[in-house]
Amino acid sequence: MEETTIPFKSLHSREYQGHKKKVHSVAWNSNGTKLASGSVDQTARIWNIEPHGHSKAKDLELKGHTDSVDQLCWDPKHSDLVATASGDKSVRLWDARSGKCTQQVELSGENINITYKPDGTHVAVGNRDDELTILDVRKFKPLHRRKFNYEVNEIAWNMPGDFFFLTTGLGTVEVLSYPSLKPLDTLTAHTAGCYCIAIDPKGRYFAVGSADSLVSLWDISDMLCLRTFTKLEWPVRTISFNYSGEYIASASEDLFIDIANVQTGRTVHQIPCRAAMNSVEWNPKYNLLAYAGDDKNPKYNTDEGVFRIFGFESS
């Protein structure tokens, strides 16, 4: 596929309103038909998105958390189950059809990161106290708990589920074997803290975003850095590979989202935004990029509570 085959320049963003405060996290379900958004307003919402359809989306509110919903993720094997991590110390599992909470567990601290194992059996949760908890999805009970003596940020499994990655405030990526959680490797990735990590859906690469404003691309088989993406000037808060693994989106406090070609490192498009971004995520089936940030209403200086999706042929 040539770089020029996706006409990014002619594609549009649509705005989705519903939250009362800013949106911290956006995530697509496994078949790309639903998007979940988590907000400081203590709710998550489920949106049915038609990739080629009109922009009127009916949404479903998930209520129950008593603090900010900081991150959420969908069960990779079930397109109607979504897990939310909140500052209220709980993790909840929801049915996106009914909007009901089906499972919940109270953990020891304010939860800020959550990710599913690719086979859907386990969920990893990270909190503000640098503690990692692995939950068994069936029983929704902790299997492992591990406290680290350094800042732990975003976490991820590789596709086969035998490696577990931690990004750290030391500028390293810790690679642990799974399920033993024994250290395998420490990758000196950046000159400042590493904040976010994304796994290429084809399983070849992972990417790391850092406070040094760079995104690094790594070969997952030999753990070597292949290249860096240098367009952003502020700490990188969020990154995502598109479904084919050809493009990577990255965002920060810069007022644009960078979309780069993974193979060449070249920027192919930039999406202008009005505020620092908290979350970007590509749809797993289509070139639709959901993004959410600290948007304010300019008149009242209040949170707008919106997110947007880029990639539609009409606005």
Swiss-Prot record:
CDD domains on file: WD40
GO cellular component: Cul4-RING E3 ubiquitin ligase complex; THO complex
Disruption phenotype: Developmental defects as well as reduced levels of endogenous trans-acting small interfering RNA (ta-siRNA).
Source organism, top-level taxon: Eukaryota
InterPro entries the record matches: G-protein_beta_WD-40_rep (IPR020472), Tex1/THOC3 (IPR040132), WD40/YVTN_repeat-like_dom_sf (IPR015943), WD40_repeat_CS (IPR019775), WD40_repeat_dom_sf (IPR036322), WD40_rpt (IPR001680)
PROSITE patterns for this protein: WD_REPEATS_1, WD_REPEATS_2, WD_REPEATS_REGION
Disulfide bond entries: none
Alphabetical keyword list: mRNA processing, mRNA splicing, mRNA transport, Nucleus, Repeat, RNA-binding, RNA-mediated gene silencing, Transport, WD repeat
Example GO molecular function: RNA binding
Subunit structure: Component of the THO complex, which is composed of THO1, THO2, THO3, THO5, THO6 and THO7.
Primary role: Acts as a component of the THO subcomplex of the TREX complex which is thought to couple mRNA transcription, processing and nuclear export. Contributes to the integrity of the endogenous trans-acting small interfering RNA (ta-siRNA) pathway. May process or transport a long RNA molecule so that it can be a template for secondary siRNA production. May participate in the trafficking of siRNA precursors to the ARGONAUTE catalytic center. Required for the generation of functional messenger ribonucleoproteins (mRNPs).
Record-given protein name: THO complex subunit 3
Classification of source organism: Eukaryota, Viridiplantae, Streptophyta, Embryophyta, Tracheophyta
